[in-house]
Swiss-Prot record:
Catalytic activity entry: 5-[(5-phospho-1-deoxy-D-ribulos-1-ylimino)methylamino]-1-(5-phospho-beta-D-ribosyl)imidazole-4-carboxamide + L-glutamine = D-erythro-1-(imidazol-4-yl)glycerol 3-phosphate + 5-amino-1-(5-phospho-beta-D-ribosyl)imidazole-4-carboxamide + L-glutamate + H(+)
Protein name (record): Imidazole glycerol phosphate synthase subunit HisF
UniProt keyword Amino-acid biosynthesis present: yes
Species name: Buchnera aphidicola subsp. Schizaphis graminum (strain Sg)
InterPro entries cross-referenced by the UniProt entry: Aldolase_TIM, His_biosynth, HisF, IGPS_HisA/HisF, RibuloseP-bd_barrel
Any one Pfam family match given in the protein's UniProt record, by short name: His_biosynth
GO biological process assignments: L-histidine biosynthetic process
Family as reported in the entry's similarity comment: Belongs to the HisA/HisF family.
Length: 258
C-alpha cells in the first residue's frame, strides 16, 4: 500500500507566499525559501507552489526561486504557473522541480496534457482543477484564471466531466481545488470528493477546507484520496505536521513517519 501524502501548498505572488479565502483577498504570509525549509524540517511529504498570477498575466512562473528551493529541500515539489508548452515544462523541471502542474492552459489546449506526459512521463504531469459549486445549476463547474478575481470565469465544463477528460489526455495526478471551501477551515467537501473519486483512477489530491487534524482523516477515510493539500492551517501553525501524522497513523493509515 502506498503511503498517503500530506502536502503543503504555497501560493506565490511577486516572489512571496500569500493566502486568501476562496481565491480572493490574498495576504502575505511569508518567504518562499524560509517556508520551504520549515515545512521540510517539520516532515511534510511534498510541497506544491502555485504562481497564482502567472497565467492571468500571460507569463511563466519565475524560475529563480525554483532553483533555490531545489537546492535546500530533499522532498518532492511541484510547480504551477503559466506553463503553456512542453518547453515551459522543460524549463521548470530543469531547474529542479519534480512535477509540473497545469490548469488554465489545459483548458485552452487539452492536448498539452498529452504532450507533457509523453515527453516527461505521467508521474511528472499534474492537472489542477478549480471547482466551484454553481448554486443555480446545482452542479460543480470548472473555473479558469482563478489567480485574478477580476478575470476568473466559469467554463462550460462540469468538474466531473473535466476529470474524465484530463485522465484520457494523460494526467498522472489530479489536484481538486474545492473553491467553495478554500480558506474556510471547516473541512473538505467530502460529497464532491466521493463523486470525483468514483471517476478518478489516477492519484487524487484533495485541496480546500482543512481546519483540524480530523478533516485530513475524513478526506482519507471517507473519500479514499491519495493525498491532502493544505495551506492556512500549516502557515498559521494551527495543525502541527508531526502531530498530524501520528494522529493519522493511530487511525490506521499508512503515513510516512517524520
Amino acid at each position: 500500500m502506498l503511503a498517503k501524502r500530506i502536502i503543503a501548498c504555497l501560493d506565490v505572488n511577486n516572489g512571496v507566499v500569500v493566502k486568501g479565502i476562496q481565491f480572493k483577498n490574498h495576504e502575505i504570509v511569508g518567504d518562499i525559501i524560509s517556508l520551504s525549509k520549515r515545512y521540510t524540517k517539520e516532515g511534510i511529504d511534498e510541497l506544491v507552489f502555485y504562481d497564482i498570477t502567472a497565467s492571468t498575466n500571460n507569463k511563466l512562473v519565475d524560475r529563480s526561486w525554483i532553483k533555490k528551493v531545489a537546492e535546500i529541500i530533499n522532498i518532492p515539489f511541484c510547480v504551477a504557473g503559466g506553463i503553456k508548452s512542453v518547453e515551459d515544462a522543460q524549463n521548470i523541471l530543469s531547474f529542479g522541480a519534480d512535477k509540473i502542474s497545469i490548469n488554465s492552459s489545459a483548458l485552452i489546449d487539452p492536448d498539452l496534457i498529452t504532450k507533457i506526459a509523453n515527453r516527461f512521463g505521467v508521474q511528472c504531469t499534474v492537472v489542477g482543477i478549480d471547482s466551484w459549486f454553481d448554486s443555480d445549476k446545482k452542479k460543480y463547474m470548472v473555473q479558469q484564471y482563478t489567480g485574478d478575481a477580476n478575470r476568473t470565469y466559469q467554463t462550460d465544463w462540469e468538474t466531473i466531466d473535466w476529470v474524465e477528460k484530463v485522465q484520457k489526455k494523460g494526467a498522472g495526478e489530479i489536484v481538486l481545488n474545492m473553491m467553495n471551501q478554500d480558506g474556510l477551515q471547516n473541512g473538505y467537501d467530502l460529497s464532491q470528493l466521493n463523486e470525483i473519486r468514483k471517476k478518478c483512477k489516477v492519484p487524487l489530491i484533495a485541496s480546500g477546507g482543512a481546519g483540524c487534524a480530523d478533516h485530513f482523516y475524513q478526506a482519507f477515510d471517507h473519500a479514499n484520496v491519495d493525498g491532502v493539500l493544505a495551506a492556512s492551517v500549516f502557515h498559521k501553525k494551527i495543525v502541527n505536521i508531526k502531530d498530524l501524522k501520528y494522529f493519522l497513523i493511530q487511525k490506521g493509515l499508512e503515513i510516512r513517519i517524520c
